[in-house]
Regions:
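Detector for a conserved hydrophobic position within an alpha-helical segment of the HATPase_c
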Residues: 140-141
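Glycine-rich ATP-binding loops of the HATPase_c
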Residues: 144-151
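Conserved catalytic submotifs in the C-terminal HATPase_c
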Residues: 28-43
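A conserved beta-strand-to-alpha-helix junction within the catalytic ATP-binding
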Residues: 4-17, 35
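Conserved micro-motifs of the catalytic ATP-binding
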Residues: 1, 43-46, 122
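ATP-lid-like helix-loop hinge signature
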Residues: 2-4, 24-31, 63-96
Length: 169
């Protein structure tokens, strides 16, 4: 399997499109807003299908968290402070960065410490496998020579940052 030149923005957009039905308003909450701030990033050599899986895992988790949070808030409160996912891309030296953040409740430190562990999940039995973020990190680090990190504080939301090298290796 060889790497292909790929526009990450296209991968992100197609993933958001797949999740569109989950972002729409429902009886429990208004629509989740997706805000994009695409910096001018180059196409990179990568395995597009694998990176799309990474985007899907992170974005689907963000939707899960916001869905879960909305069950503890009134529709009106959610209209006032809308739930959102922000996707930013930029070039930082020889890296392309994709940052995906939500304005959910944030992650406690003890969960953050284990978030990329194989089989670790905070979801109810039958809801999560504990594989999504472990696989996402493996794809980014082992297959692409990049990094996948998380920053979060309780009450401050969560941001996952994917950094991928620009170049051919």
């Amino acid at each position: 399997e060889t790497k292909q030149t790929f526009d990450l923005r296209e991968g992100i957009e197609s993933t958001v499109l797949i999740l569109q039905h989950r972002l729409k308003a429902n009886e429990r909450r208004p629509a989740i807003e997706v805000v994009t701030d695409y910096g001018n990033i180059p196409h990179i050599a990568c395995f597009p299908g694998q990176l799309n899986q990474v985007f899907m895992n992170i974005l689907a988790n963000a939707v899960d968290v916001l869905d879960e949070t909305s069950s503890h808030q009134s529709y009106r409160d959610l209209e006032v402070k809308s739930q959102s996912i922000t996707i930013r891309t930029r070039v930082e030296k020889n890296w392309v960065e994709v940052a995906i953040s939500d304005n959910g409740p944030g992650i406690p430190d003890e969960v953050k410490a284990k978030i990329f562990d194989h089989l670790f999940t905070t979801k109810d039995i039958g809801q999560g496998t504990g594989l999504g973020l472990a696989i996402a990190r493996q794809i980014v680090e082992e297959k692409h020579g990049g990094t996948l990190t998380v920053q979060s504080a309780l009450g401050q939301g969560t941001e996952f940052c994917i950094r991928l090298p620009i170049g051919d290796d």
